[in-house]
Amino acid sequence: MKRKITALMLALTTLTSVSAVNVSAAENGYVEIFVSPAGSDDNPGTADKPLKTAIAARNKVRELKKSGGLGEKGTVVNFREGTYAFSEALSLNEEDSGTEESPITYRAYLDEEVSFIGGVDITPSAFEEVKDESILNRLVDRNMQGKLYRVNLFKEGVKEIPKPYLLGTYSYWQVAGTQGEGDCVIMADLVEALGYDRKAAKSPELFVDDELMEVAKYPNSGYLSIEGITEPGPFMRNWNDDIVGSSDWVAPADRIPTPFRFTAKSISERLKYWQTADQAIMWGRWYYDWATQSVPLAKVNPESCEITSAVPSAFSIRTNQAWYIYNLLEEIDEPGEYFMDQKTGYLYYYPTKDMSSIKSVVLTLLDGNVVDIHNAKYINFKGIDVGRSRRSAFNLENCENVHISDADISYTASMAVKIYNSTNCTVKDSHIHDVDGGVEINNCGDRANLIRGNCGVENCEIDNFARLTKTYTTAVNLSNGCGNYARNNEIHNAQHMAVGFSGPYHEISFNNIYNVCQEADDSGVIYTGRSLATHWGSVVKNNYIHDCTPNVTFRIGTIAVYLDDFLSGVTVAGNVIENMQLAGMFSGYNNIWTNNIFINCTSNSVVTAFSANISAAGLRPTLIDGWKAATYKTNDAWKTAFPALYALTEDNLKNDIVTTGNVVANNYSWNSSGYDIIETMRQSPDNVIKDNVESVRDPGFVDAENKVYLLKENAQIFKDLPDFKPIPFTRIGRYEKRAQERISKAVVMTIASPYVFVDGEKKMINDSEQEQMPVIINNSTYVPLRFVGEAFDADVSFDDATRQAQISNDEITLNFSLDDLAKVSKNGEEKALENPLRVIGGRTYVPLRAVSELLDKEVFWDDSGFIAVSDTENLFNSEADGSMIDYLRNKLSMY
């Protein structure tokens, strides 16, 4: 129906208010500070005279706090659209804290696009074409004349070019203990002796017109393979003191860190060029696919086609393993490649387009996190994109109630967000992508006393992570601590694992995880391991883990949930696992696998219990020493929560022929293999292995063809497994899609915000008047009359002669008298309004519930101030849909 807005709107602007209601931000209890790239730090920070930098805004908040000028309900720092480059971190501490009643919020103003970056601008016009023959002759590609450019970074104000950071999980490995006589050589010592600092930030990266360029490497895509080996170097894992007594253990006196040497005859023509590459680095999966390591190049012999490293590989090397070489001028041969010469200060670049058309060049030189928060409370970051950082976008330490939401975090060289030693801190409703890692929650909560940290990652999409380190760098890592969570996230596209955890009472739930572990064997999508005592009470439940198959030759393959090396005390329940090799692998004590569905898993088993006792696995020192040191042994909280753990004795651990307390029951395997439970575990009366179905019959899904794995009420699975509990499959993953479906035919709003959703589309109640928003008067919600007409697709008109406003659709006509605000007529029948019309700021407001019900609509109200109006009764349930309501309310909220 065509909407009609007539002279009513002009008439309403002249009416006198009958109820004084405060609607401006300041009058509503909020103080607002404004920041703009076009501002000045000498300005007062008002809307018309904004500040220029985030640091100046922080200082303004400090001034207001000291003078008692913060808002009663909160203080908001509004960033206007643009990019804010940080030469130093935005550091917040205790003096920057808000309170529960009055938090401090840093936000993008009115959904404008705001970016924080840890980079500096390099003048595009400062680049000059390279004509020096001595440089061009170093390049493998002999046709680079007129294509290569360079800029002197020292002349651009860059004081120092840091030595490259060695990428890879094992590049700085602390490999040895202190048993025996002699010095202990560790990998970190070897590379630091060459000037590679393990504590340094990652290498600076180059962005041209907001796109990431790539350090010169060979090959440009894919990998080379180790062809022949002339010196494998030591297997340094055998230097670790956790295998003292083993025949493999190497005593300190015998530890010789010999670099490795291999042949590369297939690329013999290139090797002569590499002789001048004095800053080149080789990356490889030198022995195991999960053990990535970068090593400096030491020597190239073109005659013998031998390549020698400067330090050993952590695990020696073997043939056919993947490697490549990077950080060398000689291999610039593709548009977008660059090389920073640490010695001369020149940045060499092969542009992707005409150099004269380039508008911006940014080099990430900030040696720190973009936002650093220590010992602070009640701070929010909302709607701000953060990235291009050599470390993290956000680093939180010893914080409480710090929340990051609605952010786009990208191109960090470390974890996107680090949360350490904190409580009630969250990352929500955000997109984290093209980062080295996602979110690390470390030591949050009191593990010794089982007090939950309640820090979490929720409703985020995390993809294309581990872009630099490749392995053991996760989308979410719940490390140590107690009681933290990762839920309702969508995680995809990575070479190795998605989620790691250690510690008790962690929850990994309702996540949709796919297309990870793409280039690693013996890897887990959700992985943890090697602890008897510290992980009890953690749960992996109601996740959809699917379509993760490695692109490498594998011995074991990819495992959906991998409880490695006698990890104990974890529950895995209610998961749907599809198109994997193995659904699960475990050993340990008191692990529970129940109520899971496995679909099209290709290995010879879906769940494997791979070892029965610690001695057989050769892990006795590590596991038993860790068990002895566990803090739970002297703590009543642990004794009460986990009596089975408390009952374990050292005699059990050393002499048990089988681990106990395990449950594998009530699982359904469809078009997959069976259950490979080691016989001693299966036969033990102290383990429960039963009611596990293998079937080629559809379990009874609502729509298996379209992967809707919700179970029908009469599903076959309930006949085969009467105790099987329905898995809430439609609640898995991010809220966004489900929320959009839920509100696709509804009007959704929240108190004190000008934003609304109308049939799923976000808009403002009045684009030209931000102050128009739902307000509460005498416990009734009021909204502008004009908005009601527009939102419900009705005609709105005004009769000058009768001074009546009208809202009408095909079935209902409502007439309001502007001379009697307490009455309304519906289809000619006069009715009294319990709450009369109000005039606020020259606009007529109507009681939302009354008018909605007169239009035969249903109104849902949540105590948070969230309101939904639709044709559906009980469109939401405050308890069951609490997280979705919070998500939608956050999308609408001004503060």
Language-model regions: role of each:
Residues 377-387, 400-413, 423-436, 449-466, ...:
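Right-handed parallel beta-helix
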Residues 30, 34-398, 620-635, 651, ...:
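Extracellular polysaccharide-degrading/modifying enzymes targeting complex plant/algal/animal polysaccharides
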